[in-house]
Amino acid sequence: MSNGAPFPLDYRGTRNYGPRFIPDRYSTFVSSARKSPRTPPGGSDQVVHVNDAGVYKRTFAVASPFPKSEFFYSSVGVGDAIGAMTDTKKHRVRRSILGPRLRAKAIAPYTPSLQKLVIACMDIMAGKARQGKVINLLRYTRALTVDVISDFTFGRPMGVVNEAEEMPDLLNDLEVFGRHFHILKHFPISRKLLDIIPESFARKLMPLPGFFELREKATTAVNEAVVERQAGKTISNNTDGASFLDLLLNQIDENPSVLVDEGCAFITGGSDTTGFTMENATYLILSHPHILQSLLQELDTSPHIRDTFDLDHILRLPFLTAIIKETLRLYTPAPSPLPRTVPAEGIDVHGHFLPGGTILTHSLYLIHHNPVLFADPKSFKPERWLGTQGKVLEQYYVPFSKGSRSCIGMALAYHEVYTYLSLLFSRFEMEIFETSQSDMDWREHFFVKRNGQLRIRIVRDRWTGEAFPTRAVEADLR
């Protein structure tokens, strides 16, 4: 423990690579502790980062007495959303409303719609390839994930997949806001000011590019849904299940600002992390030819992808599953330390007593990169998840966190990633185009943002045999 350590929730520096630098500075299980400039009223003056899987299991267990820390989650810009709730009773009620809609069995009827969106993305990508253009993969993965999560949230997709622009406005707003998320995180007063001052003044006062545009789009969607509801119409346009707005309006009398918070949170969290995983998996597979060949062998021998798409079967493909797990381990989508508040009785951590009110943080990234748990943790080794060894490692596999506050959208995210990867690699022969490891390195803004972009060139359509121009030209990226 060190009182001279940098504030563990503030890793911004010149390179801003977040928790990856903690193990280099601290070799003990307690990585850092210091007086926090943002201590909650009546709380302890310590923020302690613990890099210990056993303590993590205790802190993040089901019905854990360690609640989310209000001083942090109230500042993230969507305080009324389920992911930011710090009141355990309110969270339990909200999860009981939304949780059943996001279980695997409830999602299953959506598979044909999901498959249709993925194929639409790939058809557009093939059209670009015919023109000899390079594919900016983020444009298509984020369009796909935004359309999926908006369909679940508002009852209709936002239609980003089929927009003609190289970078549609909504995707640009999400990307820009993601890169400025740290402003809300490190200056929590800015979120409170947004609630009490006119928006026109707030836009000039606070440098939050993308935030206002995102809330404006979510507000429009919520207002349209409420008007339809008042007219006696069902909000959802699809037959695969009720939208989140339907469910919330059925169960509780929520005011529009709460619904907007929930909408913004689902759109941001449900698109950014899933799209990030799709891109990382694509890069890692194409960067390791022997892994690509093993994956193609598994996909090509399956009759449940091209001919009759059977997601239940695809979810059980062992090597594809190993690739996805290893991608989520190596590139954990939410690496930022997750703060929890120590209950009143305190906790003993390996001989260190932490009093009630202490802010205790854990990083999922550090668990996934602990060399004691994962041999050669910086290497991409999907085979570690196969057989008996893989079953042993499951207890330390936490990309969506654990316990009562684990990611509510986990099953939907898996459905999207499995569908995307199985169809993409079954259909296209691809290669990485002028993308370096430096481009793939990330910066922590609670979620993660890369230094550069992943660009690929599609060489051939394996389903039709069509070969695309071998001399690719830069896409017109904005």
From Swiss-Prot:
One family from Pfam that matches here is p450
Reported EC number(s) for this entry are: 1.-.-.-
Listed binding positions for heme are C407
EC supergroup of this enzyme: oxidoreductase
Tell me the route in metabolism or biology where this protein functions.
Secondary metabolite biosynthesis; Alkaloid biosynthesis; Mycotoxin biosynthesis
Which segments of the protein form a coiled coil according to its record?
none
| Swiss-Prot/TrEMBL cofactor(s) | heme
An example molecular function term from Gene Ontology annotations: monooxygenase activity
Task: Indicate yes or no for the key word Cell membrane.
Answer: no
Q: Which InterPro entries match?
A: Cyt_P450, Cyt_P450_CS, Cyt_P450_E_grp-I, Cyt_P450_sf, Cytochrome_P450_monoxygenase
On whether Calcium is a keyword of this UniProt record, the answer is no
Can you tell which superkingdom this protein's organism belongs to?
Eukaryota
- What exactly does this protein do? Cytochrome P450 monooxygenase; part of the gene cluster that mediates the biosynthesis of the aspoquinolone mycotoxins. The role of asqL within the aspoquinolone pathway has still to be determined. The first step of the pathway is catalyzed by the nonribosomal peptide synthetase asqK that condenses anthranilic acid and O-methyl-L-tyrosine to produce 4'-methoxycyclopeptin. 4'-methoxycyclopeptin is then converted to 4'-methoxydehydrocyclopeptin by the ketoglutarate-dependent dioxygenase asqJ. AsqJ also converts its first product 4'-methoxydehydrocyclopeptin to 4'-methoxycyclopenin.
PANTHER family with a match to the protein in the record: CYTOCHROME P450, CYTOCHROME P450 MONOOXYGENASE ASQL-RELATED
* Protein's name in the database: Cytochrome P450 monooxygenase asqL
Native organism = Emericella nidulans (strain FGSC A4 / ATCC 38163 / CBS 112.46 / NRRL 194 / M139) (Aspergillus nidulans)
